[in-house]
């Protein structure tokens, strides 16, 4: 072909036009070789483009999962690892019921996975399961949040999205599921084509309506901007489940030091002001309000040993002497206000669950939020969850009330607390003193 093209160009005396078109200079004797080279390069380029297109088509070929074992492996192994392997933040929609998933899966199923980047998930909740009288759905959801505390979830009532059966990771992957009569995945179609994935994302997003939001992940700034925490303490009936230290009923000797940490170490005048305001607010609350403190036995022992508390958003380590003063102040204030009650939860009796309790719960029966102490030592995950649903708040309140009667929960009022302290004070003081030598 190169020879025929060369002969035709020379016979028509259009060599100059050829040189202009291909931006080259060529003598008649070299024309055939030049045309051959151009044809060869163009052929190689077109083959490369065709190969790339073919590879893309292969990459984007959907997967159809029909075998129970394949479905289990995909959702429990492949998909979590796939999400972790991505290099940037993830935006996920899931219309499937998280309560059913949490109840059917081991609570520590993903405990070996560590997220390296932010993941924000909007997910559906079957409120029939969540509000069931046996509390199985409620407990499963709490353990699920704890086990996946590096992921930020927004939980929605899934009443209007139950037929969608869709999971979509924006720009990445979409999974369309067919469910059996027990709402378990029977068939799953996995789509990788980014264009199709994002079309599915756009079609699915409207199902997550603001009016259906039950609880959502919240960052520090958002939590303070609208005075949420200040307003929270204006009520008079509190339930606190504390999973790290005991930041309440602090002695006066600690307040200025915590304020100074906020101001000098955090360089945060706003947080220093928040701490100072809470000091005044809490002094009033502790005088007469009803307060039920639920404290994990494991976190209480850890506090005696290391003195770590997180006051508002300030990490503070109580000195051995401050811890002793703290105990004395707790005893004194609980005697002044008989509405202060303590419940020690022996989390070691919660088989396979004791390592799954990380989020503290702060509840005044009108407003409720969860706090993630671990977030103050990592770069991913939510600081707080704000619960918006009044029905969910009442369900959690009722569950905490019932927790008082559990075999693994010990009740202490002012008298029994003093009796316990009189019996074990020397041991507690020795433990506190020994902790100073571990530094």
Question: What are the functions of these language-model segments?
Answer:
Residues 1-20:
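Basic, Lys/Arg-rich alpha-helical nucleic-acid-recognition elements, primarily the DNA-binding modules
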Residues 7, 41, 333-336, 427-430, ...:
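Surface-exposed polar/charged interaction patches
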Residues 25-91:
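Extended, compositionally biased accessory segments flanking or bridging domains
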Residues 61-411:
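Hydrophobic protein-protein interaction segments
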Residues 390, 395-439:
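Charge-biased C-terminal accessory regions appended to nucleic-acid-, cytoskeletal NTPase
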């Amino acid at each position: 072909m190169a020879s025929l093209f060369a002969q035709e160009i020379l016979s028509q005396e259009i060599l100059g036009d050829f040189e202009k078109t291909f931006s080259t200079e060529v003598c008649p004797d070299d024309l055939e070789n030049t045309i051959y080279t151009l044809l060869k390069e163009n052929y190689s380029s077109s083959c490369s483009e065709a190969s790339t297109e073919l590879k893309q088509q292969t990459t984007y070929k959907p997967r159809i999962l029909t075998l129970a074992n394949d479905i289990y492996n995909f959702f429990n192994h492949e998909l979590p690892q796939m999400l972790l392997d991505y290099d940037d933040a993830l935006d996920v929609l899931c219309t499937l019921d998280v309560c059913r998933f949490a109840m059917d899966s081991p609570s520590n199923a993903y405990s070996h996975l560590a997220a390296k980047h932010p993941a924000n998930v909007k997910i559906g909740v079957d409120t029939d399961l969540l509000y069931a009288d046996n509390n199985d759905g409620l407990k499963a959801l709490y353990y699920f949040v704890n086990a996946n505390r590096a992921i930020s979830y927004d939980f929605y009532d899934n009443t209007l999205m139950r037929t969608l059966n869709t999971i979509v990771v924006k720009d990445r992957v979409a999974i369309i599921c067919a469910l059996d009569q027990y709402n378990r995945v029977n068939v799953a179609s996995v789509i990788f084509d980014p264009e199709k994935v994002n079309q599915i994302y756009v079609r699915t997003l409207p199902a997550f309506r603001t009016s259906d939001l039950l609880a959502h992940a919240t960052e520090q700034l958002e939590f303070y901007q609208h005075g949420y925490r200040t307003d929270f303490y204006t009520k008079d009936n509190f339930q606190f489940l504390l999973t790290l230290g005991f930041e309440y009923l602090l002695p006066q000797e600690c307040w200025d030091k915590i304020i100074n940490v906020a101001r000098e170490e955090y360089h945060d005048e706003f947080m220093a002001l928040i701490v100072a305001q809470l000091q005044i607010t809490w002094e009033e609350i502790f005088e007469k309000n009803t307060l039920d403190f639920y404290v994990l036995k494991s976190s209480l022992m850890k506090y005696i040993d290391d003195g770590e508390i997180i006051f508002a958003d300030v990490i503070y380590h109580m000195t051995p002497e401050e811890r002793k003063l703290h105990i004395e102040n707790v005893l004194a204030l609980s005697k002044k206000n008989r509405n202060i009650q303590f419940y020690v939860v022996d989390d070691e009796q919660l088989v396979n669950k004791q390592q799954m309790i990380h989020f503290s719960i702060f509840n005044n029966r009108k407003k409720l939020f969860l706090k993630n102490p671990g977030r103050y030592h990592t770069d991913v995950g939510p600081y707080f969850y704000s619960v918006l649903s009044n029905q969910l708040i009442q369900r959690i309140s009722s569950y905490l009330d019932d927790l008082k009667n559990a075999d693994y929960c010990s009740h202490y009022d002012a008298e029994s607390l003093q009796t316990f302290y009189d019996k074990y004070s020397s041991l507690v003081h020795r433990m506190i003193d020994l902790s100073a030598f571990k530094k």
